[in-house]
Amino acid sequence: MAAAKGIAIGIDLGTTYSCVGVFQHGKVEIIANDQGNRTTPSYVAFTDTERLIGDAAKNQVAMNPQNTVFDAKRLIGRKFNDPVVQSDMKLWPFQVINEGGKPKVLVSYKGENKAFYPEEISSMVLTKMKETAEAFLGHPVTNAVITVPAYFNDSQRQATKDAGVIAGLNVLRIINEPTAAAIAYGLDKGGRGERHVLIFDLGGGTFDVSILTIDDGIFEVKATAGDTHLGGEDFDNRLVSHFVEEFKRKHKKDISQNKRAVRRLRTACERAKRTLSSSTQANLEIDSLYEGIDFYTSITRARFEELCADLFRGTLEPVEKALRDAKMDKAKIHDIVLVGGSTRIPKVQRLLQDYFNGRDLNKSINPDEAVAYGAAVQAAILMGDKSEKVQDLLLLDVAPLSLGLETAGGVMTALIKRNSTIPTKQTQIFTTYSDNQPGVLIQVYEGERAMTKDNNLLGRFDLTGIPPAPRGVPQIEVTFDIDANGILNVTAMDKSTGKANKITITNDKGRLSKEEIERMVLDAEKYKAEDEVQREKIAAKNALESYAFNMKSVVSDEGLKGKISESDKKKILDKCNELLSWLEANQLAEKDEFDHKRKELEQMCNPIITKLYQGGCTGPACGTGYAPGRPATGPTIEEVD
């Protein structure tokens, strides 16, 4: 057995599932847990007698929803009044309380109420992963690399590190999930010439797009974009809402307020979603779901795709943003890599493939395991593994925001530009603004706006003792130096005297949240017009798609048989199908094209629908109140004579 001190593990701490790997004997082993599963649910449950972690916790969730905690990753490193926390709280069956501005999860454990910080919940999941690795290796393990989404801010990274410490781990480094996946991918491919790789990571709870350049074993992150709140859970939510409505229609009962019923339904929905990645239909059978009523139903892949259409299409926006940030055309991307269980959804793959003009997607890495695989390799590198496979690998990350200082008139002068590779060091010469100025105030900011008042102040310090001289004569050398962990050192030195002063800006100085980073980037004037155009385009696209789907369901309704001629019905269905196919191939068309296509469809449908209503109403469809643009499943409206 190898000496314990020489072994380090890689942990993918996911929102919904976690995974652990170890690099030994020249290859990565992804380690199965005690249930034989290679991924473990990021769930912790508390009962009257015990604490359960992983599969055991998830398996009993329907019976004990209030005391089963998941999604700790959505809380970690956030304040209680963070809008993300406030909106998520509405969806969780467990209770979140405010303690000194920080969120804590309140549960009943062994008969008494206990409150846990998110770091504590995450540390329990990490402990489970640590024990899984120890059972496989046969000795204790303390060293680990843990991954986080690329957009996690410093407090979220620090809190994740704290969770590792609570779990008894020595956290060697926190690395980005897409970066970890890139390492896995780089090892699989071997470095032959420069390649641009787009990593599309759609997991259970977060979505990240990263563009990397891999050249001869050197990885460079060119750009990252994403959404901290998009993933498999959101697709589950759409299915849950769909079936809650169906139950209401069939049985005239609302189950949405019954936490246990919703939880059981959610479990069945997750299973159905997975089935739909390989089959075109999935059946749900839930005995005694609510008030003794059995719920047996089914859903097709097409209906699932329709329910999540906007979410699926929305995954292309961060792809476009990352390409813009990397100043790269989509034709320049050599490989598209799928990471995260949700990338198994055929529609997601199809949209991405269409966007890249039918290019093949790289699915050679198991999407659930790629991140842990890369983390395990990085752990081996940090432990000094001399294996030929890893020794030439070098990893470069990027700064998510520009860093600079305030110059005369409150202007932001950036020394390190957004998306610069880190570690990095930049030096610039500044001078005094007035005659005989005895000192300068160095104020360090991060952000994309032209004026410092619109950016985020990270810290400030004075450099004094400058010899009297006319303005513009003294030479003050300012150096910005970021290390591999994102810690910034700013030094100012008067070149005539050699006198210097410095400040270190570390992770715990309350850096920006992802939302603020996004706000500052999007607020920047140059993006305003572009954002507006994009919003209008998406609204027009959605309007066209929903109108086409509505028309299809109106004319296909059984209750309208005999009210509409087969030729009219065929005409509408053919036109709708033609437009939906066009949409498939042109998701990124212009607003005017979408509007034009919708008007075209309306001009064809309106006379037929009007004729339908003027024909009177005697059949079973009487009173269903169909109208152009109204969903076929809309509310019943009584007809007035």
Swiss-Prot record:
Task: Could you list this entry's UniProt keywords, alphabetically sorted.
Answer: ATP-binding, Chaperone, Nucleotide-binding, Stress response
| Domains: entry comment | The N-terminal nucleotide binding domain (NBD) (also known as the ATPase domain) is responsible for binding and hydrolyzing ATP. The C-terminal substrate-binding domain (SBD) (also known as peptide-binding domain) binds to the client/substrate proteins. The two domains are allosterically coupled so that, when ATP is bound to the NBD, the SBD binds relatively weakly to clients. When ADP is bound in the NBD, a conformational change enhances the affinity of the SBD for client proteins.
What domain of life is recorded for the organism? Answer: Eukaryota
Q: Which family does it belong to?
A: Belongs to the heat shock protein 70 family.
What are the BP-aspect GO terms?
binding of sperm to zona pellucida; positive regulation of protein targeting to mitochondrion; protein refolding
Q: Where is this region: Substrate-binding domain (SBD)?
A: 396-511
Q: What does this protein do?
A: Molecular chaperone implicated in a wide variety of cellular processes, including protection of the proteome from stress, folding and transport of newly synthesized polypeptides, activation of proteolysis of misfolded proteins and the formation and dissociation of protein complexes. Plays a pivotal role in the protein quality control system, ensuring the correct folding of proteins, the re-folding of misfolded proteins and controlling the targeting of proteins for subsequent degradation. This is achieved through cycles of ATP binding, ATP hydrolysis and ADP release, mediated by co-chaperones.
Binding site residues for ATP: 14-17, 73, 204-206, 270-277, 341-344
* PROSITE patterns referenced in this protein's UniProt entry, alphabetically: HSP70_1 (PS00297), HSP70_2 (PS00329), HSP70_3 (PS01036)
What ranges does the record give for the region Nucleotide-binding domain (NBD), renumbered to this chain?
Answer: 3-388
GO cellular component annotations of the record = cell body; COP9 signalosome; cytosol; zona pellucida receptor complex
- Its source organism is Macaca fascicularis
The family database entries (Gene3D superfamilies) matched by this protein are listed as: 1.20.1270.10, 3.30.30.30, 3.30.420.40, Actin, Chain A, domain 4 (3.90.640.10), Substrate Binding Domain Of DNAk, Chain A, domain 1 (2.60.34.10)
Q: Which Pfam families match?
A: HSP70 (PF00012)
InterPro entries per the UniProt record, alphabetical: ATPase_NBD (IPR043129), Heat_shock_70_CS (IPR018181), HSP70_C_sf (IPR029048), HSP70_peptide-bd_sf (IPR029047), Hsp_70_fam (IPR013126)
Give yes or no: UniProt keyword Chaperone: yes
> Mind telling me what this protein is named?
Heat shock 70 kDa protein 1-like
Complex formation = Interacts with PRKN.
